[in-house]
Amino acid sequence: MTVSIYLAKGRDKALRRRHPWIFSRGIDRIDGKAELGETVEIYANNGEWLARGAFSPQSQIRARVWTFDKNEAIDKDFFVRKLNQAQALRDVLAERDGLTGYRLIAAESDGLPGITIDRYQDYFVCQLLSAGAEATKDLLVEALVECYPDCNIYERSDVSVRKKEGLKQRTGVLHGEEPPESVVIEENGVKISVDIVNGHKTGFYLDQRDSRERACKYVKDKSVLNCFSYTGGFGLYALKGGAKHVINADVSQLALDTAKYNAEINKFDLSKAEFLNADVFKLLREYRDNGTKFDVVIMDPPKFAESKNQLTGACRGYKDINMLAMQILNPGGTLLTYSCSGLMDAGLFQKIVADAALDAHRTVQFIERFEQAADHPLDSAYPEGFYLKGFACRVV
């Protein structure tokens, strides 16, 4: 028997605007008992059919919409269509930017709620973040194999958000071969080694590709401090852009070793690069206290806010770190600063940077805005898909 969800009166407006989430508080009743991730029918309170989605009994997001087409079944062909639609956009980007690594599926923004797929050469790395994504995993793998016959599929569902969906963390091969320690991709003429099994996220921060390329114009003949460098993404582009000297700072020696390897495979001048194992907050204070200055500081920290109750603390963290960055910049220097916290909108982040300038006793001019790369699209009905924001700031 098909399970049916009936929304409370007046709670169908977002769904009619094609927002893909149904919250528990918006449900009037459920007819039938749905299993974790089961496909259910969704109706307005008056019985009008609205959508078909995946049920998640433990999450505040009680259902995520697969389709608004009553005649569309959630089967292998459904996933094949979604993959082909997504690939059409990425083909344009891959040709334009010379990409062999990109985000193929950006979850809700590509019509597949809770499913993220990053492609590194012929390795497809899946993160399944919702009950529906987990329940349809076999169909997804079948669809990937049909669309990409030579693919290798690896799961990196080792993220804490799965607990909210009643799911355990999982990693491992879903199809084909285990990824090697290093898969080298290329973007904008830069080679990057990716560790799919042990790296952050699915191995690399693909969403910052456009920002990395745009950073090049600020660094020629400049001294650059690349904070939270991970495997050196921004630092590599700084060397590409003609920086005089680049310090890559991170707490992970493994990431720094990979950053150095990345510089080597790009044949950059290693005499212009440093790879410093350090706590960035402590390092910035040391530089401030001993008078060390830079022409450019790149500030790309990890997410500071995972939930709303962490937002206040995150604001303090972002303000402190940007204040310290401004204090070690030469007059007229450039701060490239970013936030990947989806709970913090661009307006709030800009205010935080402005407040940091006041505390640093510096004047800041916002001269450029950044956002996530084009393979992380924003669906018009799903504003939550916008999460990465950044600014180029002239600090005087």
Swiss-Prot record:
Name any one GO molecular function.
rRNA (cytosine) methyltransferase activity
- What is the protein name given in its UniProt record? Ribosomal RNA large subunit methyltransferase I
- What's a single GO CC term here? cytoplasm
Q: Which Gene3D superfamilies match?
A: PUA domain (2.30.130.10), RNA methyltransferase domain (HRMD) like (3.30.750.80), Vaccinia Virus protein VP39 (3.40.50.150)
Domain PUA: from-to ranges: 2-81
- Write the Enzyme Commission number(s) for this entry: 2.1.1.191
Family (UniProt): Belongs to the methyltransferase superfamily. RlmI family.
Transcription regulation: is it a keyword of this entry? no
Where in the cell?
Cytoplasm
The answer to whether UniProt assigns keyword Transferase to this entry is yes
- InterPro entries linked to this entry: PUA, PUA-like_sf, PUA_sf, RLMI, RlmI-like_PUA, SAM-dep_methyl-trfase, SAM-dependent_MTases_sf
Keywords, A to Z, come to: Cytoplasm, Methyltransferase, RNA-binding, rRNA processing, S-adenosyl-L-methionine, Transferase
Source organism: Aliivibrio fischeri (strain MJ11)
Report the protein's function.
Specifically methylates the cytosine at position 1962 (m5C1962) of 23S rRNA.
Q: Which Pfam families match?
A: Methyltrans_SAM (PF10672), PUA_3 (PF17785)
Membrane-crossing ranges are none
Q: Which reaction does it catalyse?
A: cytidine(1962) in 23S rRNA + S-adenosyl-L-methionine = 5-methylcytidine(1962) in 23S rRNA + S-adenosyl-L-homocysteine + H(+)
